[in-house]
């Protein structure tokens, strides 16, 4: 349930979210999203060093609703 919520919110923010059966989401966003979130004290997994992937590919864990909301708020903040 929480994975669907988080995926939907990322999609609303213009991110490409890939289907997942695991407790994390893989998505494509802005190439500098990792650096911007890091400045806000939030670390997401930059997947650009995975074979075949590029800058702007990320992975995040699906957590409790309040934690997912905090992450989404930080993403919204750095994208303003």
Descriptions of predicted regions:
Residues 29-30, 64:
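Helix N-cap/beta->alpha junction signal
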Residues 32-38:
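Short amphipathic alpha-helix segments
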């Amino acid at each position: 349930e929480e994975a669907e919520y988080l995926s939907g919110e990322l999609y609303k923010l213009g991110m490409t979210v890939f289907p997942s059966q695991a407790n994390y989401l893989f998505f494509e966003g802005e190439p500098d999203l990792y650096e911007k979130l890091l400045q806000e004290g939030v670390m997401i997994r930059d997947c650009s060093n995975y074979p075949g992937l590029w800058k702007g590919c990320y992975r995040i864990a699906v957590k409790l609703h309040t934690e997912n909301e905090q992450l989404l708020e930080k993403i919204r903040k750095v994208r303003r």
